């Protein structure tokens, strides 16, 4: 397998403390790689090492088949990135900021500026100074700058921060287009697991500086468990009915109102009928599946998909 990004034993130490420990990542060409982990897990530090903003203490980075160092200028020219908060010249317009980026990168396709502004829905305000932009607009401009030169690799740290739900949806669709139609490889960190679940081909989960697992979303979905989620104010009585009336024992109490029923053959209609006949009030009852969030929480708590 050939990877567009590979790290071997990547480690970073600050003031005697390892914040990234022996991380070996593998990102395939053209895929969207969702990078997940709690705050302070090391995601941003790794992204900074992949873009030469931070020097590794030890380990190896290979990008586009080349061993990566702070002098790998040709490789850096094929990487677009937005890490932490995007910074611009506030008194310049969106168009002028992107024009400066073209000059800096030696990229002489000025038509691309209007194309990327259109892609992130900023074309109508390209003449306004950036200091008038909202946080969400600056995030979109940061994404526009990252994709401006049509790089092979995009590294994006929390790219939808500050966006409203409609803006998030449009950026999600843009990422899918960049991957599927432009052939770009995307490494995206995000706290919005539902968004990553919709677009990622592979996820990597990190905790306390250590990569816990890399797994395809196909494998995560293959682990999905179907269940019925029952919400009732009469939980004790409901549990009695499930066990004694319906002989259902594979269920779990989540909180004072919510019960998850994992019986594969359980019928919602039969459960509903039995509960009603026994004077159990039903606030809601729905068939659901385990999600990326369920998997993530389970993994962070010490269980892997391969366990």
Curated annotation (Swiss-Prot):
CDD domains: ABC_BcrA_bacitracin_resist. Keywords: ATP-binding, Nucleotide-binding, Transport. PROSITE patterns: ABC_TRANSPORTER_1, ABC_TRANSPORTER_2. Residues 5-233 form the ABC transporter domain. ATP binds at residues 37-44. Pfam families: ABC_tran. The keyword Iron-sulfur does not apply. One of its GO terms (molecular function) is ATP binding. Belongs to the ABC transporter superfamily. This is Uncharacterized ABC transporter ATP-binding protein YcbN.
């Amino acid at each position: 397998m050939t990877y567009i990004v590979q790290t071997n034993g990547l480690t970073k130490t600050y003031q005697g403390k390892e914040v990234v420990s022996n991380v070996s990542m593998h990102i395939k060409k053209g895929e969207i790689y969702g990078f997940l982990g709690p705050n302070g897990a090391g995601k941003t530090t790794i992204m900074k090492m992949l873009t030469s903003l931070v020097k590794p203490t030890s380990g190896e980075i290979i990008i586009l088949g080349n061993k990566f160092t702070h002098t790998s200028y040709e490789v850096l020219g094929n990487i677009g990135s937005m890490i932490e908060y995007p910074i611009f010249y506030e008194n310049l317009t969106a168009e002028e900021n992107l024009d400066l980026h073209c000059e800096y990168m030696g990229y002489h396709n000025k038509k691309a500026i209007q194309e990327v502004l259109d892609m992130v829905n900023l074309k109508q305000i390209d003449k306004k100074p950036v200091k008038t932009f909202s946080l969400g607009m600056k995030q979109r401009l940061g994404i526009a700058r990252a994709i401006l030169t049509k790089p092979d690799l995009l590294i994006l740290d929390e790219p939808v921060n500050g966006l409203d739900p409609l803006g998030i949806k449009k950026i999600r669709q843009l990422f899918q287009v960049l991957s599927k139609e432009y052939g770009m490889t995307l490494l995206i960190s995000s706290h919005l697991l539902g968004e990553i679940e919709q677009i990622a081909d592979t996820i990597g989960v990190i905790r306390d500086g250590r990569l816990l697992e890399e797994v395809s979303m196909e494998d995560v979905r293959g682990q999905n468990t179907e269940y019925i989620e029952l919400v009732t104010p009469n939980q004790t009585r409901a549990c009695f009915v499930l066990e004694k009336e319906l002989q259902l024992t594979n269920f779990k109490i989540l909180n004072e109102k919510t019960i998850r029923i994992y019986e594969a053959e359980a019928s919602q209609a039969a459960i509903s009928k039995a509960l009603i006949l026994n004077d159990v009030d039903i606030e809601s009852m729905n068939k659901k599946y385990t999600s990326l969030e369920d998997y993530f929480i389970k993994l962070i708590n010490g269980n892997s998909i391969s366990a």
